[in-house]
Amino acid sequence: MALVHYMNVSRSTFPLSRSSKINLSSSFASLPLQFHKNIKRLESSVPPSASASASPAFPIDVEYLRREFSGHGATFEDIGETCIARLKLDNGSSANVMLTRGMITSYKVRVWHGGKVELLHTWVEQEEEEVVIRGGVSSAFRSSDSDEISDWRLQGISGDSKDCVQMELRRSDKKIKEIELKQIISLRENTLSIELSMTNKGISPIKLEGCSLVSYLTVSTPEATYAVGLEGSDFVETTPFLPRFGVVQGEKEEEKPGFGGEEESNYKQLNREMSRIYTCAPKSFTVIDRGRRNSVVVGREGFEEVYMYSPGSRLESYTKSAYVCIGPSSLLSPISLESGCVWRGVLHLHNPNS
């Protein structure tokens, strides 16, 4: 079973790794993730259809979003009962966000040869009577019931197409009502950052298990793909997990982690099938694809672990099926929040090839 993030359309300063010599640009080394002061928010006076999550009762008012947020580097496209927000900068970088699921389905960047390439891998499947989009980047949490997860709703957008576009989404947990969840998606010239923020508004401590921000990176083939900068990092082999609608659902009979060890290679080839949690890894490392002559710097804040999955060579080379899954997680150690405390975790995808 492969790790899969998916959503349903019809329902509503990074230190360098110890041995890596790849330099990060100064803009990536210190990314301000607080929301701009000139943010435009959806006020309470807005009709329910404009601010409610996508559902048959309250469909998103796309025309309102277009009127309210024009000039902020964002456009909106209606796709049934949900909406795609397209973030774009003047340099050509762009990202597509599925609003109700908080899922990034596309991240395109300008590279050394002057063209643009897609960094994320997504695909569409028909499941029963519904269309399902898999892959991309999305957050997930361990739970027993996908119905406990509510849709993300747009809170506001700030910035402009020249320097940075930021979008804030919010969501509530139907099971743990004391938790306030925020997701801030920031598109800069060469970096896409996804920040997940959780606030304990209750009076008792809480624990969140199985949190992750995993990205599906498109590659030419796993044989040509390498993770650079992980030498000396401790890891634990584990079975792939399956996030459904933002819920991490593990294989119950195989949930316990297996063999552990230390990464021996600083140039780890991802040609073999693997599902691994790195428990002691640098805050940033690089994924190189020799086939596409491309690379991505994967960075994190807040999270202590890095999850990595490769389907190995069983996938046909140089097709739309080739991908690797990489991102920060807390699959082994839950996130503990005292009353009134805030936790934040960030995934950075940086393009060093422009």
From Swiss-Prot:
The keyword Thylakoid appears for this protein: yes
Transit peptide start and end: 1-49
Key words, A-Z: Chaperone, Chloroplast, Membrane, Plastid, Thylakoid, Transit peptide
Disruption phenotype: Impaired chloroplastic NAD(P)H dehydrogenase (NDH) activity, probably due to a reduced stability of the NDH complex.
GO MF: carbohydrate binding; catalytic activity
InterPro entries: Gal_mutarotase_sf_dom, GH-type_carb-bd
Subcellular location: Plastid, Chloroplast thylakoid membrane
Listed GO CC annotations: chloroplast; chloroplast thylakoid membrane; membrane
GO annotation, biological process: carbohydrate metabolic process; photosynthetic electron transport in photosystem I; positive regulation of gene expression
Reported function: Required for both formation and activity of the chloroplast NAD(P)H dehydrogenase (NDH) complex of the photosynthetic electron transport chain. May function in assembly or stabilization of the NDH complex.
PANTHER family: APOSPORY-ASSOCIATED PROTEIN C-RELATED, PROTEIN NDH-DEPENDENT CYCLIC ELECTRON FLOW 5
Protein name (Swiss-Prot/TrEMBL): Protein NDH-DEPENDENT CYCLIC ELECTRON FLOW 5
Gene, per the UniProt record: NDF5
